[in-house]
Amino acid sequence: MMHLENTPTFHGFHMPAEWEPHSQCWIGWPERADNWRDGAVHAQLVFTRVAAAISRFEKVTVCASSAQWENARNQLPDHVRVVEISSNDSWFRDIGPTFVVRRETSKSDDAEHRIAGIDWTFNSWGGLEDGCYCDWSLDSLVKKKILDVERIPRFSHSMVLEGGSIHVDGEGTCITTEECLLNKNRNPHLSKSQIEDELKAYLGVRKVIWLPRGLYGDDDTNGHVDNMCCFVRPGAVLLSWTDDKTDPQYERSEEAYSLFSSVTDANGRKFEVIKLHVPGPLYMTEKEAAGVFQDDGAKPRLPGTRLAASYVNFYIANGAIIAPQFGDKKWDDEAIRVLSKTFPHHEVVGIEGSREIVLSGGNIHCITQQQPAI
């Protein structure tokens, strides 16, 4: 594996928008019983649905441990590649590499030198004191392993960052949240301006928009932006919304809406904000919590916990939107309607049973990682 010195922008790289063409999608395979209920059997069915749906539009590689490889291979469609890569859990948005690309700069450039991956530091969303589990040693190797398998050059970075904490428009703008990136459990030695400088140097952006907070109840990640809002095109965002003024989410949504109304992107465009209503609220049931093996190795899953359920947490595939469906028919149907109107040239595919993913802290965007086409 080639390790590149200096920063991605020094070499002419930038992070493309998620709607730009992909060569494939990377997904993990859930198995840990202290996070996924009933030994992850329900989650594995939903991960299989997600992988199968995405594989209609682009190649998919699923990474499973040696103990789970055969099980994953048997459940997944034959055309989905399954490779043996172990991880502590299956959140590939956060433990997978952030891919960056550059335009061809000389005749000597070949394809493999037009894409690279960023190997951010990972600390299980908060380290030993606040993180979701106490051993993340396997997660820390996933980026290196994927880049090695694909023979893609690697940039390493000592800054703690997860892929779900950033969104880019591919034209110079990044959105993140202060709740996550300025949390003392990530990079307490770095100031806001220093973190912003690193984002610019590694993602190739010129402007960083800081939302104060993420989705209410998204305590595992400390408010990742990918549960709160996302770009749908340059100058336009989808924002998690609620009309219920008694819901604590209302204040957060209004706060973000107000911010987007007062700023412009890197190219001076005002933002169009499209509201996407959250489901529920949804809460973990006694039965669901009882199915999680509680030990000292991971955060407990307790009955009555509000689930960080958001329709913004979808995946943009080549020509498709792979969107969560939580079993709340009113808002499930509304989400499909809004997404279909927002992405008129994409097929919107709803994944039934997405509640199984959010029970463990994330959703479809959190379990996927796109690899750009070059």
Curated annotation (Swiss-Prot):
Catalytic function, reaction form: agmatine + H2O = N-carbamoylputrescine + NH4(+)
Entry's EC annotation: 3.5.3.12
UniProt binding sites for agmatine: 220, 226
GO molecular function, one term: protein-arginine deiminase activity
Gene Ontology terms describing biological process: putrescine biosynthetic process from arginine
Top-rank lineage group of the source organism: Eukaryota
Entry annotated with the keyword Cell membrane: no
Keywords in alphabetical order: Hydrolase, Polyamine biosynthesis
Keyword Isomerase assigned: no
Active site: 366 (amidino-cysteine intermediate)
Pathway info: Amine and polyamine biosynthesis; putrescine biosynthesis via agmatine pathway; N-carbamoylputrescine from agmatine: step 1/1
Pfam families the UniProt entry points to: PAD_porph (PF04371)
Function text: Mediates the hydrolysis of agmatine into N-carbamoylputrescine in the arginine decarboxylase (ADC) pathway of putrescine biosynthesis, a basic polyamine.
Record text on subunit structure and interactions: Forms homodimers.
UniProt family annotation: Belongs to the agmatine deiminase family.
HAMAP family: Agmatine_deimin
NCBIfam families the record matches: agmatine_aguA, PRK13551.1
Protein name (database record): Agmatine deiminase
Species this chain originates from: Medicago truncatula (Barrel medic)
